[in-house]
Each structure stands twice: as structure tokens, then as C-alpha cells.
Amino acid sequence: MNPVIKKFQFGQSTVTLETGRIARQASGAVLVTVDDDVSVLVTVVGAKQADPGKGFFPLSVHYQEKTYAAGKIPGGFFKREGRPSEKETLTSRLIDRPIRPLFPEGFMNEVQVVCTVVSTSKKTDPDIAAMIGTSAALAISGIPFDGPIGAARVAFHESTGYLLNPTYEQLAASSLDMVVAGTEEAVLMVESEAKELTEDQMLGAVLFAHDEFQSVIKAVKELAAEAAKPTWDWDWAAAPEATELLGAIRAEFGEAISQAYTITVKADRYARLGELKDQVVAKLSGEEGQPSASDVKAAFGEIEYRTVRENIVNGKPRIDGRDTRTVRPLNIEVGVLPKTHGSALFTRGETQALVVATLGTARDAQLLDTLEGEKKDPFMLHYNFPPFSVGECGRMGGAGRREIGHGRLARRSVQAMLPAADVFPYTIRVVSEITESNGSSSMASVCGASLALMDAGVPMKAPVAGIAMGLVKEGEKFAVLTDILGDEDHLGDMDFKVAGTAKGVTALQMDIKIKGITEEIMEIALGQALEARLNILGQMNQIIGQSRTELSANAPTMIAMKIDTDKIRDVIGKGGATIRAICEETKASIDIEDDGSIKIFGETKEAAEAARQRVLGITAEAEIGKIYVGKVERIVDFGAFVNILPGKDGLVHISMLSDARVEKVTDILKEGQEVEVLVLDVDNRGRIKLSIKDVAAAKASGV
């Protein structure tokens, strides 16, 4: 073994790249260690044979966190890692997005990237180490790849400015959590959430990260110079263009294709383009000496691509007739589902989201078992994309990677505007059902989520809206598009999603398919996005401008109270018997914290209030000079014990029964009898002294 090791400084951290010691049968393998904090093993394997029948580049990225990395044993019956967690799925997507555009066009060999977290101190997120390792493993693998890439996480504090690769603790106090990846020349991917930062601050963070991760790219190049395998014998040049075929299609069908792209209804447009494609295939393939049907279809697609892009950069109307800055018509409704806690139907052109907010108790929070330990998440946002939303039949089942990713983006967009847990201690679940889709369904989910939460009475700090921007760049000409359609996303060069309030940005996601995106283009895109966001917020505010002052009648009632910590065991009871009895009898749920904070949730106000009274009864202290209605529990020779509060009995001495002389207590009282008693005293041992004979005088004096 002759391992090759490269060390470099990355911000405050020392990063070590090592290859040649572990996983030597992979095409490329790198162990990335950041200080003594995180170690990630990244392997890349490329199939030697192409699979052109797939019709897409078969790249798969698998990020996995092993529990042994944090010195833990997995839970569950089998005691081993199972299906990928949401965090693992999202990180896999984060790594996939910047590397996918850097493989050559037409490359159809399967490539699999596996990133395994093998050691962590749980202080920082291992995702940046995994991205650096992926860049390095690809660079030394010999697989055709136009890298390397660098990656960095950026935080922001008003007082100290931008911070490179923050710890979890530093992120908690930050106004920004942004991951940026790209090549030496260009930014390729941005994923972020923020607390209402300005567009300039967001752009500054992107440029800061790009400058900082140049050290990563330099180190990877140095590693590759020493340890890279021979580059595959792959023809990087694209297949020779079928000039004659393209010319024939354009000559005979070019005008018809151009006209088809003026049909504004997506289904009608697709139907017309399908007819034209069939006509082209029938006319130009099938006979001996003619191109194959697949070649003709590919050429037809190229004509479509060029037609749409040429129209846009030359200033012609877009597919649906809009100019570059106009948002599609909006239709907004709230309270559309009578039995839900909050609901909204948000329609933008041919994209529609039915969004529902549900409030639950603290026990409904999602339990997350992470490398950092178990924690509860009181906010969930789930995004569903059924096949009928695009007029197709398809698989129904659990959420895929795309749905998980879109749901997380929508969650990031609204999370900063949610109230603090001590102000609004409900668990919140938002579900976005995409019922129609023609571009930017994730941003429709953001708008719908904000509306549904306000409809449910969740005290949002401010309404949130989102917009998707696109880009078409041909040479020096470019056009930034507001509110892109599905076709514009597919045929364009950039997907740029921005969400925020009227005050600032709360989420930014960017994926770029080409090189040469300049600071100027990003600045224009952010400016147009702000203009569109304010337009959408204005229309949303006309329907519901602030959260409802009362929760839905269908939502659970929550009562918060606090008791002395010494009383917690009294409320819980032996083996939980007391609290269990209260919950069963009142149909409410009770959560008690170690500091004595209690949250009572009831399906109705009456249930919650009944439980509160029971808790008050258990925790209340007898007040000297107060009259109580009590029940005689036990009679003794010298008096009677009367229960005045749950678990609290006081003694009425025989001399305190009546002004007249009493021979026997049973002459006055019997067990089970209800009587009014006055609290005379409570000694330092908690013993309560009661009187019956002084009740009348106390009442007369106004007690």
C-alpha cells in the first residue's frame, strides 16, 4: 500500500484527503478527515460499458450515516441501519446536483457514488466533507468528469459577517445556513435557508463561498496529479450533428413547431407536438437508407429546444404569451376544507397546490434518531406529487427523493416565520397536495403553506411567498425568466427558486446547468424574484393578510400552566396512575416538563379545562382563612379528618365542631358527609387545622 495524502487549510479547519489505503478496488476512493471532527469515506465506481438504452445518464449518489461513527448502536429489532433517513436522502441530492452537469453529454456509463460517514464528533454536519470527497474521488477515478468541484457552508451574523463551515452551535445563532458548490470558474448549486436577509446579503454569501472553496479545488487537483488513474478512452466530443436531418425537419415542420409553442394550454400544446413528432417520424424514417426513428425523435427534440430558446433570447413572447417579468394569473382561496384546522387552494396558471395545516399535541412531534442523538421536531411539511397532477398514470406510494427534496425546500421557506415553541407550543404538520403542475410546484407549496398556517390561526411573523426563476443564455445574449413553466425549466439553463417575506429572503435554491453564470445574471434574477414575490404577497394579503386571531374550532385546545417542581410526582402519581386516570377520564393529554411546565391538550375546550381543574386540585395548597367544602373521611375520638383538596386532609378537633359541648364526634358528623370547614392553620409539616364552628362567623365577616 502506498497511500497518497494531501492536507490543506479550509477556513479554520485542516482537511486531509487520503487515497490508496481503503477501498482500492473502487474506481476512486478518498477518505476525507476534517480536523478530528468528521471522517467520510467516499467511493466512486463507473461501469466500463455504456447503457444507451436508458435514455438518461445513470448516476446514483448514496450518502449514509453509520451509527458506529458516533459510538451508537442502532435501535429497532434488527439493530442495524435500515432505509435512508430524510437527512441522508437530502444530502444525497445535495451531492448529486452539482456533479451531474459536469459529466459529458452522451455519457451513458453507470456511475455510483457512495459517501459513508465513518466517524463524527457530532459538532458539524458531515455533508461538506462528503461533497469534497466526491469531488476528489471522481478526480482520481479516470471517469470523464469536468471537475473538480468545491463546496462550502456559510453562516451569517449581523455583527461578525460571513462565517465559513460553522458548527451546529454556530448555526443555531446564525441568520443563514447556505451550502454552495461549484467549479473554479462558476457556481453550480446553492441550497439555503435564512431569516429575512436581503438579496445583496444572499448574493454576498454565494460569492464568499465561491472564493473560499478555491482551496478545495486546488487541493483536489494536487491529489489527482499524484494519484489519478488514466483517463478513460472516451470521446468527449458530442456525436456529429445530423445537420441534414435537422435541416429537413426545420424546412418542412419548423413553422408548425414554432406555432405549436404558441398554444398556451399545456395539454393542447403537448397533443399538437405529439402529432407533429409522429408526422416527422413517419416521413423521415422507416425506409432503407433513412435515419432511425430514435434519431429522428432526437432531432425533433433538438429543433424544439432551439425554437423555444431562440424565441426567448430574441425577445419574442414566451410559450404562454407572457414577457420575461410577468407572473401567471393567481387564484387564491382559504378555508376550502371545512373540517381541517387550516387550508388553502393556491393556483398560479396551470400549477395548483391544495395545502392543509394540522395542529397537534407535543406528543405528535416527529421523533428523529440522528447521529447527534434523539430529538423531537414539532414542525413537518410534506409534499405530494401524484401522477394525475400532470395528466398521467403512474406509481402511487411512498415519497420519492424529489418529493422529499421539494418538501424540505418549502419547509425551509416558511420555518423562520413560525412562532417560537414557548409562544405556540403546538406540533404543526403541513401537507401540500400538488393537484396540477406546470412549473414551480414547490413555490406554490410555499405560498399555500403560508396561507393555510394563517388560516389555522398559527401566529406567523409574516406571510411568505416563493417564485421560480429561469435563464436562457445563448452566447452573450441572455434572458432571465420570472415564474417559469415546466417546459422552460426543462429547456432552460438555470432553476433559481427564491422564497421570502416583504422584508427579506427566507430560502434560496439554485441549480445551474451551464458554465458562465455571472454575478450580473444572479443579481438580475434576485431583483426580478423580489419584484414577483412582492406582487404575489400583495395578492395573498388581499385574501388573508395576517393570522386568524382564534384557532379553528376543529383544532385541539391547549392550556399551559406551571406547578411547583415538588408537586410533579403528585400529578404523575405512583407508576403514573394519577396522570393516567386524569387523561382517561377527561379525554385530554398532559405533558409535564422537569421545570414544572404543563401543557394540557384537549379535543374540546371542556376536556382541557376539566383536566386543568384536576391538576389544580392536586397541586393546590390549603389557604389559611379560606372556607372549603370537604368530605368527612375518618372519625376518631378527638375529632374528624376532612378531605378539602385531592390528597389533602385536615383535622377538625372535637372542640372545633360546635360552640356547644360535644360528647361524641358521631353526634355531629358521620363518614362520607359533606361539610363546610374553615382553614385555621397549616403547620411547617403541612398539617392542616380546620374548624366547623367558625364558618358562620367567617362568612359574616366576608371571607
Curated annotation (Swiss-Prot):
Pfam families attached to this UniProt entry: KH_1 (PF00013), PNPase (PF03726), RNase_PH (PF01138), RNase_PH_C (PF03725), S1 (PF00575)
Keyword terms: Cytoplasm, Magnesium, Metal-binding, Nucleotidyltransferase, RNA-binding, Transferase
Gene Ontology process terms (BP): mRNA catabolic process; RNA processing
Cellular localisation: Cytoplasm
Enzyme class label: transferase
CC terms in the record's Gene Ontology section: cytosol
Catalytic activity: RNA(n+1) + phosphate = RNA(n) + a ribonucleoside 5'-diphosphate
Residues that bind Mg(2+): 489, 495
UniProt EC number: 2.7.7.8
GO MF annotation: an example: magnesium ion binding
Family: Belongs to the polyribonucleotide nucleotidyltransferase family.
Function: Involved in mRNA degradation. Catalyzes the phosphorolysis of single-stranded polyribonucleotides processively in the 3'- to 5'-direction.
HAMAP family associated with the record: PNPase
Protein's recorded name: Polyribonucleotide nucleotidyltransferase
Species: Pseudomonas fluorescens (strain ATCC BAA-477 / NRRL B-23932 / Pf-5)
Classification of source organism: Bacteria, Pseudomonadati, Pseudomonadota, Gammaproteobacteria, Pseudomonadales
